[in-house]
């Protein structure tokens, strides 16, 4: 008799039970690992699967996390074979070529499209009913690519979009007003990146419109120079990359925030990347961030934002820029 047999006596034979809230993270780079740890520490799933083509790095990261199993409630698995991801509820894609210092997000594009041609069909094969969340940059274009390659309905393919930009925006407004970001309501929509659109008309604290108090807010003629805050949001990622080589923690927390809304069926509104054709005068098949409701079925609703003419024009310009790149892609 083995030690195990001496210690434990069986009462019944267990039938294998599938995971009820499995999440997969594709890519164990800085963003993938920050997303993984954020998801684990928020206790969002009963199983976390990780995949990557770099086998040693993957093995090391999985082992390192498994060594902390005592402090977690989640089963952690990893393999370069996508069968490990089978029956995931949410699949988070962070894999891709990393943005170099000074490189625009749009520049990355074709490099990452080629990587997606391998990843997406594998996800679809093993988790045909999952909600696909794209984080890799340029996120809006790659969400479109993932949607096209997966054949999924649009409500099951979302991009992390401007969820992080809006968080940065709210943090910086909070710094200026000496308030917690959760009390500063503000939205950034459009492209995640250089042509994102701050909705100054909607910025409020406790329902008090800041533009109502300062009609010049967000314009060139504003003596308080609020416009600089949006510039800081846009430059924020480049600044972090310049200082530490990559961004990870904030985007990881942002991903976990989105995963939580889906897994817990929260019906919470987030600015995430979705198909905006036909909204705000956008004519082309592009994905941009607008406020969306996230729940168990994915992206269930879109909120109709009241945008000023100037804001709408910026959004359309974003869409044109993205379409210009998209139509050149070989899918």
Curated annotation (Swiss-Prot):
Keyword Transferase among record annotations: no
Domain of life: Eukaryota
One Pfam family per UniProt: Ldh_1_C
One GO BP: lactate metabolic process
UniProt-annotated binding residues for substrate: 105, 137, 168, 247
Reaction(s) catalysed by this chain's protein: (S)-lactate + NAD(+) = pyruvate + NADH + H(+)
Compartments where found: Cytoplasm
Enzyme Commission number(s): 1.1.1.27
NCBIfam families noted in UniProt: L-LDH-NAD (TIGR01771), PRK06223.1 (NF004863)
PANTHER family the record matches: L-2-HYDROXYCARBOXYLATE DEHYDROGENASE (NAD(P)(+)), L-LACTATE DEHYDROGENASE A CHAIN
Protein name stated in the entry: L-lactate dehydrogenase A chain
Organism (species): Champsocephalus gunnari
Phylogenetic placement of the source organism: Eukaryota, Metazoa, Chordata, Craniata, Vertebrata
